[in-house]
Amino acid sequence: RKTVLYPQKSGKLEIEPLSLDIDVQVPTNRRNIFGQVQLVEDNKRVSAGSKTITVRPLPEAGKPEGFSGAVGKFNFTVTPSKTNLKNGESLDLKVAVSGTGNLKLFTLPRPVVPSSIELYDPVHNEKIQTPLSGMNGQISDLYTIIPQFKGKYPIKPMSFSYFDLGSGRYKTITSPE
């Protein structure tokens, strides 16, 4: 059996051995009337050895402010459901990260809105697969936004930072206003 592991701390980490209890058939010294060796069931425990791996820490140099632990190769989008509203209408703002990496181990950035706009807690959605090549898919937060007064309210650009294993550098993607 193969498993994808995502370390959450650096240093030397020990992976405990995998143990299985299996039933095996063991030959006895007796034979049946046809001369065949008789077998009995026995329970055996098999164990793989423990493994020690060395996990390098992420570099401190160049770490962006607001870095939340994303490691991999990602795309970042901020998409409003509408750009023009009538009085009393709301809009949904989708903040999404897609790609390959530790998708379940970081938090998405939260939009910053003026005090005259109500921002409700997000609905979190995950569409993730974990094949042996690594975790991939999309995570998103869907915010409902309701302006309290008529006017133009630009949504400030949002930034998402991640560590790109391919280049060995931090990368930051910023949404348009």
Regions from the language model: what does each represent?
Residues 1-177:
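Surface-exposed interaction/ligand-binding surfaces
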